[in-house]
Swiss-Prot record:
It holds the Pfam family Pantoate_ligase. This is Pantothenate synthetase. The keyword ATP-binding applies. The active site is at residue 38. The gene is panC. The keyword Transport does not apply. Beta-alanine binds at residue 62.
Amino acid sequence: MIQTITDLSALRALVTGWKREGLRVALVPTMGNLHAGHYSLVMLARQYADRVVSSVFVNPTQFGPNEDFARYPRTPEADMRGLEDAGCDALWLPDVDTMYPLGTALATPIHAPGVSDVLEGVCRPGHFDGVCTVVARLFNQVQPDVAAFGKKDYQQLAVIRQMVADLAFPIEILGGSIVREADGLAMSSRNQYLSADDRPISAQIRKVLLQMRDSHAAGVPRLQVEAAATQALEAVGFRVDYTALRLPDLSEPDDGASNPAAGPRVALIAARIGSTRLIDNLEF
C-alpha cells in the first residue's frame, strides 16, 4: 500500500527509517497528471533502489507568465493508483508553502549556466531556473540516493546532471527512455490538449526526427538538416520554436557539415500545433 505524505517531518522520518535499515532510496519527481512514461521511471528507479518516493508538485516557478500553470491538469487520485501499481512506496505531496516557505518571490534561485541558456532556455526564459530550484529542494527534502528523470525532456536532464555535479549532490541521476504512443508521439501530460484534428498531425514530429537522423547519416550539412526539418513541420501546420542537431552536451557541432563518424548526436524539436506545445528528441 502506497503511503501518501503531506508533512515534511513525516517524510524525513520515513526516509531516515529506511536508511537506518540500509535501504537505498530513489526519487521520481513529477508534476502529476501521470502516464505510462512516468510509471516507467518508477519501475526504472526500482531497479536501483529498495524504496521509491514519487513527488507530485505543480511548480509555479517553472511556468512563464503566458504559460499553462492554472490549467495544468491535476489528477491526484488517478496518479496515486498508477504509482501504487508501478511499485512506488511513498507519494510526497508538498504544498506551495512547504516547498517555498519564504514565498516564491524570496526563493533562492539556482541557475545552471550554459546548458540552461540555449533552445528551451531561449524559448522559455527562467524555466530551467525554476526546475533547478524545485528539484534541489526535493533533493534536500527526500535525500535520495538515486533520482530518475525522463529523456523526453532531454535538456532538462542535462541541466539536472550539471546542477548535481556542480553542487556535489550525492545522487545518481538516471535517464529513462521515452515512452511513445503507437503512432510515435512521445507521451506527455500536455497531449490531452490536442484537438481531434491536431492529434494525428502531432505524430509527424517523430517522423521528422527520423528524417533528421537519416539526413545526418547521409552527410547533409547540419544547417540544411535543421532547415529541412523546420520546413517539413511547417508544411503540416506546426509553428516551430526550433529544430536542432546537437552534440550530446547540447553544444553545436563545430563542423559545418554532418559527419556520422564524428560521434553521437541528438536531434531536438519544439513546435506548436493548435494551442499545444510539444517537444521531442532522438539520440543517435
